[in-house]
Curated annotation (Swiss-Prot):
Pfam family, one: DUF555
Name of the protein: UPF0212 protein Memar_0858
Highest taxon, organism lineage: Archaea
UniProt record similarity statement: Belongs to the UPF0212 family.
Lineage per the UniProt record: Archaea, Methanobacteriati, Methanobacteriota, Stenosarchaea group, Methanomicrobia
């Protein structure tokens, strides 16, 4: 059975924030705190998207009225999964249990 690298997308809402950089830092910190005891092997990064006009990379954070929506990318290695779908289900289950009410979406599954 092969090993997989599963990439998940998550959305975090941060209140009372002053800047986009603060919002991203707080979101990564909060995700790390929730994942640390049970799923400390999950890598957390700020999400990036491609600009449709200049094709440069943009941060996936938006701050309006001191409230931010931050997109994070979570990566987890899943060992000995039966298929890509099985690896995605395992990753969503492990990360979902630690993060509770945070929406998750499978972005990519790569065989290692």
């Amino acid at each position: 059975m092969p090993d997989y690298l599963v990439t998940l997308e998550s959305a975090w809402i941060i209140k009372d924030v002053k800047s986009m950089d603060d919002a991203v830092s707080i979101a990564i910190s909060e995700a790390g705190k929730r994942l640390n005891p049970s799923a400390k092997f999950v890598e957390i990064e700020a999400g990036m998207i491609a600009c449709p006009f200049c094709e440069g990379e943009l941060n996936t954070a938006l701050v309006v009225a001191a409230t931010a929506l931050v997109g994070l990318v979570l990566q987890m290695k899943v060992f000995r999964a039966e298929s890509e779908e099985h690896a995605a289900r395992i990753a969503k289950s492990v990360v979902g249990k630690a993060l509770h009410d945070v929406p998750l979406k499978v972005q990519e599954v790569q065989e290692l």
